[in-house]
């Protein structure tokens, strides 16, 4: 049995990269997407979501980046927006169903601690809400 966060990180990675397992029967995106990963606090977002997706809680640990659900060779390291240990925005290589690179998906990390305004005004393809965010 795998954990909820690990399982969700795998699915987020598939949507970001377009690299779906053959057995997957859920929704498939046929284009690069915008995905938000939203935690309760910045700290929990980094320690859970960032760690599961990128493989490390520390954005400064370049050797560990790419050891999580998102494959290292899909991460655009030149356009990885960081703030200390936090990854804020990442560009992830997306591939079509034939395996051809067709653009870059965007992943953004956010927290509800920043206020509900950070969740307004954007058209987003996929949102991972970690834990129960509503009372």
PLM regions and their residue ranges:
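Phosphate/NTP-binding elements of NTP-utilizing enzymes
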Residues: 1-135
């Amino acid at each position: 049995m795998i954990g909820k966060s690990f399982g969700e990180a795998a699915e987020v990675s598939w949507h970001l990269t377009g690299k779906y397992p053959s057995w997957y029967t859920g929704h498939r995106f046929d284009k690069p997407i915008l995905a938000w990963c939203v935690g309760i606090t910045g700290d929990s977002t980094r320690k859970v979501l960032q760690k599961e997706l990128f493989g490390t809680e520390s954005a400064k640990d370049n050797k560990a980046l790419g050891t999580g659900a998102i494959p290292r060779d899909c991460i655009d390291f030149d356009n990885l927006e960081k703030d200390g240990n936090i990854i804020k925005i990442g560009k992830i290589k997306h591939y079509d169903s034939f395996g051809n690179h067709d653009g870059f998906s965007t992943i953004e990390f956010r927290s509800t601690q920043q206020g509900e305004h950070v969740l307004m005004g954007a058209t987003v393809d996929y949102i991972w809400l970690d834990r129960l965010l509503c009372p």
